[in-house]
A protein has these predicted regions:
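Nonpolar helix-loop interface/hinge motif
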Residues: 1-47, 110-114, 149-223, 242-248
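Residue-level recognition of alpha-helix termini/interfacial anchor residues
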Residues: 21, 66, 124-125, 192
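Short, small/hydrophobic-residue-rich motifs at membrane-helix boundaries and re-entrant hairpins
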Residues: 2-105
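Sec-exported extracytoplasmic/periplasmic mature domains
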Residues: 19-20, 121-122, 138, 142, ...
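Alpha-helical membrane-spanning segments of integral membrane proteins, especially the hydrophobic core
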Residues: 69-82, 114-139
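Selective recognition of hydrophobic, aromatic-rich stretches within alpha-helical transmembrane segments
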Residues: 72-107, 140-176, 207-240
Length: 248
């Protein structure tokens, strides 16, 4: 019951932070939202087309070396373009999160759409890219084996605050590298991994709604969930700070 009340309070704080000038705050996540909708619908369309194909329509005699090479080159080029787009969207998403942190803390009342591109202007996009790449590789490698999945979940929850930690370190000038960010995130999440997992689980109906509507519900759920997780982070670091102060 205590966790439920705390989660409810954090979500109310998130709503309060979004309530005024919601349109401008929504615009910060428009690119990630539209990309999510496009990706979702492309996946559904691809699965549909695959199901429509049958073995009877495949003729191995029509496959030539030139055709096979063309297909492979097309797949390679498509993969590279997709990777570049994913990196750009990832950086823009983190740029939007940086702005949401400022909004939640009352440091930015009227956000502008161009603010999400700040990481590309100040060069922090490279830090974001490397941070996310290393995290994805390490967690991805652990999920290769069944026995590694629990460790991947443990690390994933421990590193879940990395974007917010990165923002604070960049703002305070204490950034020393990605490992400093990941270690700080793990430190902040010590004793709170299970609690944060339950917090994320409390949004499951919103995730289902987004899936049912083919992503259209994300125009509300994305700002709401993003601001709620920032509220959780702020509450987490405030609690840790108060505990440290009371220890002296």
């Amino acid at each position: 019951m205590e966790d439920t009340m705390k989660f409810k309070d954090l979500k109310e704080r998130a709503k309060d932070a979004l309530r005024e000038n919601f349109g401008a705050k929504l615009r910060l996540f428009l690119i990630p939202i539209f990309w999510g909708i496009i990706s979702t619908n492309m996946t559904y369309q691809s699965n549909y087309n695959s199901n429509m194909d049958t073995v009877n329509n495949f003729d191995a005699n029509t496959i030539t070396t030139g055709l096979l090479l063309s297909i492979l080159i097309g797949i390679l080029i498509g993969g590279l373009i997709g990777l570049m787009i994913s990196v750009i969207i990832d950086v823009i998403t983190v740029g939007a999160r940086f702005n949401y942190i400022k909004i939640y803390r009352g440091e930015r009342e009227n956000p502008r759409f161009k603010n999400i591109f700040t990481p590309f202007k100040d060069g922090s996009w490279t830090k974001i890219f490397v941070l996310h790449l290393v995290t994805a590789l390490l967690i991805g490698l652990l999920t290769v084996t069944i026995i590694g999945i629990p460790f991947a979940i443990y690390l994933g929850l421990g590193w879940s605050q990395k974007d917010y930690i990165l923002f604070d370190q960049l703002e305070s000038g204490t950034y020393t590298g990605i490992w400093g960010v990941l270690n700080a995130s793990a430190q902040v999440m010590r004793g709170s991994r299970g609690d944060y997992f339950l917090f994320l689980l409390s949004f499951i109906l919103w995730y289902i709604l987004s899936g049912i509507t083919l992503g259209l519900a994300k125009f509300w759920t994305t700002p709401y969930i993003e601001m709620s997780t920032i509220a959780y982070y702020q509450n987490l670091i405030d609690t840790k700070r108060n505990m440290n102060q009371s220890a002296y």
